[in-house]
Amino acid sequence: MLTHKTCQARKKMQVSFVIRDAEEKQHRNGVNALQLDANNGKLYSAGRDAIIRVWNTRTDSSEKYIQSMEHHNDWVNDIVLCCNGRNLISASCDTTVKVWNAQKGFCMSTLRTHRDYVQALAYAKDREQVASAGLDKAIFLWDVNTLTALTASNNTVTTSSLTGSKDSIYSLAMNPSGTVIVSGSTENILRIWDPRTCMRRMKLRGHTENVRCLVVSPDGNQVVSGSSDGTIKVWNLGQQRCVQTIHVHKEGVWSLLMSENFQYIISGSRDRNIIVTEMRNPSNKTLVCEEQAPVLSLGYNIDKTGVWATTWNSDIRCWKLPMYDRCTLNSSGGMDAQWTQGGTEVACIKGGAAIKECAVLNDKRYIITKDSQDQVVVYDVLRVVKKEQLGAVDFEAEVKKRNKQVYIPNWFTVDLKTGMPTIVLGQEEVDCFSAWVSIEAGLPECVDPTTEIKINYGKLLLEALLEYWTPPHSIPPNEMEPDMHGNGYFQVPKHTPVIFSEVGGRTVCRLLVRDAAGDSESTLLHETAPQWVTDVVIEKNIPKFLKIPFFLQPHPQMTKPERTKKDRLVANEFIQCRKVCEHVLEKVLNAETTPSGGNANNSLQNSQSDANSEGSQLPAEERIELWCNDVVVDPNMDLRTVRHFIWKQSTDLTFQYKTKQNFNYDGK
């Protein structure tokens, strides 16, 4: 038994998990941000698959992977390296900011101050100060030394906030000395603060669409901005105005990188182009490369002869930068300036495929997916594993081929946002306890021929996901009773991430299946797991059965004029139609049939005697025939499948019954 903490004000919760390999060495979706530690050549990449990965850029080997940093469960939008590369700060769509030990790759602490997606970070190196901003219109300032000193007992942190933003913030920048901080938003303006006093200094107008990227000059006097309106603007903060508008892209500018002397702009755009432009002379520009997809982020390589670029795709490429040569002698004896050739791909960190399409099969146990490389895969949702790699086959044809004529209620939803299948269980629009099936249909490998068992998919899966959870303060089991963990049928991979989150809101808890046995994880689960989870996992309560009302009446071919009675019955929706046949044979015909020359008391004996003469050992479905909508019903179908595929009406399901030829019934 467990006394579970309840909170009336707690928001509705959902549980989700990811079907994936134990170690995902490749990004499975676009990469939003890059940070390079030039001291050791480590490149940190923030993925839309919720994973931060670390790469060795000093090796020429194709195997550059070092490690993964996992604790987010949604897109990682931005990262910054701090403390000379010892720590890393990350911002995510899961509404959190996380502090990491960059060398060992583990999450040190999680900041939950934001109320919506955290889109951008800014870093003042000289002050070890980080700012975070996002769709909640809020900007928070953090002291990095304080963040890295947080422990389980010393977990209180104070933050300053910058107020005044009126719309979602998508970009943020600070100069190294931390004297200027600039934000860009869907308000289409730049707002400037002094982070030392948190005072607003000014706002700058000029862009006509969202401001997606920003860079502040080291002295804090200039700002360069890129916008979805396709322009790059240079702003003089002393003059409080735009001093240069640069048109080099056909679509939105999403990433900016400046040369050390703040004279050249490297820009990446939705038009897939990466371009170098001289800031004071915008006509002096050259194309670095055309990427395969819209460019999301840019970062220098170690010696700054090349630029790393990320896109909507999962590959990370390094391109050689062209150099601006002012020492070319022209035909008239003067000096020309020209760009040396660039645009050569000098390195590539290959990414994996992102799942783009998904179909849930009618049995509601398997899903079929198609990824960005047209590979089709079958996943077993119940066992949380990849079941079959089908290759580049016809996705729609495969779904059609594998779909059976069976109806199981939806008990989960699938989210493909990270590029990997995330399965969501809840109690809102889709009830995770709605799928009751016979064990023969759901787990044929576990069938006991001596028993007739019904299983609930959602219950079994939650028990497997939380198999290792032993709640604190739980009463020890009776010595005569086994201490039951798991579901008794199967286990799921121990590396599976399990996430508890508010419905449509922030993440509350994330852990791996195997980690639920830990003291801190167990306590956290006790505090956050919703009652509907503990009811089945801890209390071992059985989810309620869903019932279907239906009518049962004689078929016109066997009914005499005086026999038109229509019975209304209610049964569990997973009951197979053979059970209805048994009811007709044992209850309806026996109770209401009076064979000629006999009386009601011996009607069952007479009907059974007739049946015996024709082979009474046959099961009920061999003697009784059910009809629905003028279609003979397969006795193996359950009630919900008949209602879905044959009845197809909102009114109560109606069956008609009649006897088969091998059953001699006098009422025919």
UniProtKB/Swiss-Prot annotation:
PROSITE patterns given in the database record: WD_REPEATS_1 (PS00678), WD_REPEATS_2 (PS50082), WD_REPEATS_REGION (PS50294)
Q: Which family does it belong to?
A: Belongs to the WD repeat WDR48 family.
The annotated phenotype of a deletion mutant is: Viable but sterile with reduced lifespan.
Q: What is the role of this chain?
A: Regulatory component of the Usp12-46 deubiquitylase complex. activates deubiquitination by increasing the catalytic turnover without increasing the affinity of deubiquitinating enzymes for the substrate. The complex deubiquitylates the wg/wingless-signaling receptor arr/arrow, which stabilizes the receptor and increases its concentration at the cell surface; this enhances the sensitivity of cells to wg/wingless-signal stimulation.
Which proteins does it associate with, and in what oligomeric form? Catalytic component of the Usp12-46 deubiquitylase complex consisting of Usp12-46, Wdr20 and Uaf1; regulatory subunit that, together wtih Wdr20, stabilizes Usp12-46. The Usp12-46 deubiquitylase complex associates with arr/arrow; the interaction leads to deubiquitination and stabilization of arr/arrow.
What InterPro entries is this protein classified in? G-protein_beta_WD-40_rep, WD40/YVTN_repeat-like_dom_sf, WD40_repeat_CS, WD40_repeat_dom_sf, WD40_rpt, WDR48, WDR48/Bun107
Q: Which SMART domains match?
A: WD40
> Which Gene Ontology molecular-function terms are recorded?
deubiquitinase activator activity; ubiquitin binding
Q: What is this protein called?
A: WD repeat-containing protein 48 homolog
GN (gene name):
Uaf1
Show the Pfam families listed in the entry. DUF3337, WD40
Q: Which UniProt keywords apply?
A: Repeat, Ubl conjugation pathway, WD repeat
A biological-process GO annotation: double-strand break repair via homologous recombination
